[in-house]
Amino acid sequence: MANFPASLLILNGKSADNQPLREAITLLRDEGIQIHVRVTWEKGDAQRYVDEARRLGVETVIAGGGDGTINEVSTALIQIRDGVAPALGLLPLGTANDFATSAGIPEALDKALKLAIAGNAMEIDMARVNDKTCFINMATGGFGTRITTETPEKLKAALGGVSYLIHGLMRMDTLTPDRCEIRGENFHWQGDALVIGIGNGRQAGGGQQLCPTALINDGLLQLRIFTGEELLPALFSTLTQSDDNPNIIDGASAWFDIHAPHEITFNLDGEPLSGQEFHIEVLPGALRCRLPPDCPLLR
């Protein structure tokens, strides 16, 4: 692999003492691969390190962390307007790793790192909310958002993605739907929503396939609504076959407008955003990402 250009790894501070990762990086460096490593400590670090990556002339910026880290790095990359931006590499080190998992990124660190450095760079979409906040994986609203933001860190560290489901079961007494109206291209719905998923990617909340047909290079966002008419069936339908389920509403559009009579909160790759009005739009081909050739998220 000695002929591959330099890369810069932006590593979430929680993974700074990951010994297997240190060993994998050392082995690649011994093969002649140049890998710069930077560790995030506070919000804004990813943007600063992407700026540094451009000054260093690297061709790949690797996001080492969970969905939140991938979001920060990818958002910084799409801000580049002059010249060709570095490609995005994925190194899943978070609690759930929903985007990386659905994209087929290997769990083994050495294999994921090699893919992040040497994989083919494919153009993929991102999404933007209210002309400001971006997400690469999914925007989720409703009960699911409350669960992912409230799940204790110790529970996530111990159980990983399944911690979200367990915490959800513990909070069944708080199940309340959000009344809202959603419009898109050839789509209109209004009613009580228990969970709303608007996906560029397919899964969120620790492996729940909220938007199972989503693709990251089709110029569309997938919508799935779990209505509040039957709360328990809607909650568990992500674990079962959803065909002909009257509690599930699906849609696809390049944009969605959401209006609620009261404040609701969306979780954008782990970052909460509250309000009553949301305009969510796809950004086609917003960045290049190094993905496996059989990535299930590509058409």
From Swiss-Prot:
A family per Pfam: YegS_C
Enzyme class, first EC level, given as a word: transferase
GO cellular component: cytoplasm; plasma membrane
Binding sites annotated in the UniProt record for Mg(2+): L215, D218, L220
E.C. code: 2.7.1.-
Domain DAGKc, residue spans: 2-133
GO MF: ATP binding; lipid kinase activity; magnesium ion binding
Subcellular localization: Cytoplasm
Keywords: ATP-binding, Cytoplasm, Kinase, Lipid biosynthesis, Lipid metabolism, Magnesium, Metal-binding, Nucleotide-binding, Phospholipid biosynthesis, Phospholipid metabolism, Transferase
Residues reported to bind ATP: T40, G66, D67, G68, T69, I70, N71, E72, T95
Signal peptide residue numbers: none
Regions annotated as coiled coil: none
Family, similarity comment: Belongs to the diacylglycerol/lipid kinase family. YegS lipid kinase subfamily.
HAMAP family: YegS (MF_01377)
Role this protein plays: Probably phosphorylates lipids; the in vivo substrate is unknown.
Full protein name: Probable lipid kinase YegS
The organism of origin for this protein: Salmonella schwarzengrund (strain CVM19633)
Record lineage: Bacteria, Pseudomonadati, Pseudomonadota, Gammaproteobacteria, Enterobacterales
Gene: yegS
